[in-house]
Amino acid sequence: EPSEAMIETMYEAIPYDSYDRVIAVGGGAIMDLCKLLGCKRPTSVHELYFKREPVVHEKEVIAIPTTCGTGSEVTNISVAIVKDEKDGKLTGGDTKLGLVSDDIIPNKVCLVPDLLKTLPYKPFAASAIDALIHATESFLSPHRKTVTSEMFSVKAMEMILEGFRRIALEGPDARMDYLGEFVHASLFAGIAFLKAGCATVHGMSFPLGGTYHVPHGESNYALFGKILEMYDEYEPAGELGKFKEIVARCLGCTKEDALRTLNVTLEKVLHLK
């Protein structure tokens, strides 16, 4: 995860007047760092993340993702672990915060599926599950969901679930013929949660990343199944009912068995410790 100290070091190493544009090639952390390089330099990273300094886009950012999970190439958020504070005073601990502003959305995106060929399987699987969670949470959003976000979230879920179905049946190498779909699905999920936001899974996973430095995709995955079960106990119909219909259609099961089948499939894709 990017950290406050890492960002400060980056600012010191790369003078602001030494470049005209930023080309971000990497995973979500690289995207988040490079999105900041496209903005006016703050006097303090800490003040920036605690929203006491404005975010001002000034330089072109071209995003080229090498993972298929964060969707950071199309989102308006940059996440970092920063020094925590309470009532304006440092606590001595760290916290994970998202800097949200449309000024940090990259100007252009270039998707190159072949870049995923050398991505090790575990980070591939964790990032793809993260993309599925982005799509799911934006689809289930009760207040912010729009026609546009639903279109992108449904397509992302369908593409990712089909890829996971293949991996569950044929093994990890099955992903190699489906990398284009995975990288596009990640972008679609990013657009969906740019519009509709994320929810409980991401809200609860942030402390795991900030305090224990658990990788983002893995911390989300650890919470995903149980939170869906809680949703199902609280309100099994409505948007969750529609979500279960999508899962059932994609994974070839009944609507009643959708959440269990999803958990079984995800366990085959990536063992949850």
PLM feature segments, named:
Residues 1-47, 52-53, 166-178:
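N-terminal small/polar loop signature for handling phosphorylated ligands or for N-terminal nucleophile
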Residues 1-2, 29, 37-40, 66-69, ...:
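Acidic, glycine-rich active-site loops and adjacent beta-strand->loop/helix elements
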Residues 21-25, 62, 189-190:
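Short glycine-rich or small-residue beta-strand-to-loop segments that form or flank ligand, phosphate
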Residues 40-145, 238, 242:
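A glycine/threonine-rich phosphate-anchoring loop and its flanking beta-alpha core
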Residues 69, 187-220:
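Glycine-rich phosphate/pyrophosphate-binding beta-alpha loops
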Residues 121-188:
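C-terminal and late-domain segments of enzyme folds
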Residues 211-273:
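Gly/Pro-rich interdomain helix-loop hinge
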